[in-house]
Design a protein with these regions (language model features):
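Short, glycine-/Ser/Thr-/acidic-enriched flexible segments
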Residues: 14, 49-51, 56-58, 95, ...
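Gly/Ser/Thr-enriched, mixed-charge loops and adjacent short helices
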Residues: 17, 33-37, 42, 149-278, ...
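Short, highly selective alpha-helical patches that border small-molecule cofactor pockets
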Residues: 65, 98, 102, 166, ...
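Buried hydrophobic packing segments
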Residues: 68-72, 124-128, 237, 241, ...
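N-terminal small/polar loop signature for handling phosphorylated ligands or for N-terminal nucleophile
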Residues: 89-148, 247-300
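An N-terminal, well-structured beta->alpha segment
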Residues: 4-101, 192-220
Length: 300
């Protein structure tokens, strides 16, 4: 079963590089990787997709992500059939597949607002509501190791999908059985790049909900060490702290470098002490009072 499933990925519906990688798995005397890659389909669950990157039906790649996006497109077109133009937002951290997803949405006649660069998940959620979109996705594996990628789907309220939309979307995704059913050829006229203007609105709206502006004013110069751990937080969190009135933000330069390889940590999870080692060291060097860290998509 696994071999026949893998052989179906050798057809012209799949690109040459993918076919070559699948053939290499088939030719390998050790079948472990072949089995892991094809023994099941990567499941689109209530939280979207998450898995190891690579070729195969049980891996994150342009075809499994493509099927998820095509299925979501099909459901949006059913659910919002009365709208002249369905709109979605696409955000991403330092992982892949945002542009592929934009092409698929637009090929289905859906207007896409694509962030020009990596942005935090909370900002993507905000943008769904700010621009009056019907859905949004973010390509991120959050704090999982570099081998992983993920795909989270959101509804028009800016929250992750709940019933009945999650189950209905899953049903549509499961109907996609072959790469030939995925519309990859995008419509560039329906893809709009967004960035700084949304950042400014987002940060401005955040400052309006400060719980204690007076306390910030009194302690504006406290030393705060911040690290994004190579993720999206670097784009928004330092300017947000500045907008709130904090004047002494200390960076961890090695971890300001955006990279899906997360070169300074084993796992980019800020809940693990090892991920904070460089930030704590910087705090000791500078006599800082607070260490802040965010995970790669800055939702924790």
């Amino acid at each position: 079963m696994v071999r026949s499933k893998a052989q179906s990925w050798l057809t012209k519906s799949y690109d040459a590089e993918t076919r070559a990688q699948v053939q290499a798995l088939l030719d390998n005397e050790d079948p472990t990787e072949l089995i892991e890659s094809f023994y099941k389909d990567l499941e689109f669950g209530t939280g979207g997709l998450r898995g190891i990157m690579g070729v195969g039906s049980n891996r994150m790649n342009i075809y499994t992500v493509g099927a998820a996006t095509q299925g979501l497109s099909n459901y949006l077109k059913k659910e919002f059939a009365d709208l002249d133009q369905i709109k979605v937002v696409i955000g991403h951290d330092c992982r892949k597949f945002a542009e592929i997803s934009a092409d698929i949405f637009s090929a289905n006649g859906i207007k896409v607002y694509l962030f020009e660069d990596l942005r935090p998940t909370p900002e993507m959620s905000y943008t769904i509501r700010k621009l009056g979109c019907q859905s949004g996705i973010i390509l991120t594996a959050s704090h999982n190791p570099k081998e992983y990628n993920g795909y989270k789907a959101y509804w028009d309220d800016g929250a992750q999908m709940i019933a009945p939309h999650d189950k209905n979307t899953i049903a549509e995704v499961n109907k996609i059985r072959n790469a030939s059913e995925i519309k990859f050829k995008g419509n560039k006229e329906l893809i709009e790049i967004i960035g700084k203007e949304i950042d400014e609105q987002y940060i401005n709206d955040l400052t309006k909900i400060s719980l204690s502006p007076e306390s910030i004013a009194r302690h504006h110069d406290m030393k705060i060490v911040y690290t994004p751990i190579h993720g999206t937080g670097v784009t928004v969190i330092p300017p947000t702290l500045k907008a709130f009135g904090f004047t002494n933000i200390i960076h961890v330069p090695e971890q300001d470098v955006v990279s899906g390889d997360f070169p300074t940590v084993v796992s980019p999870n800020p809940e693990e002490p090892a991920a904070l080692a460089l930030a704590v060291e910087k705090a000791k060097e500078t006599d800082a009072e607070l260490v802040l860290a965010s995970d790669p998509d800055a939702d924790r």
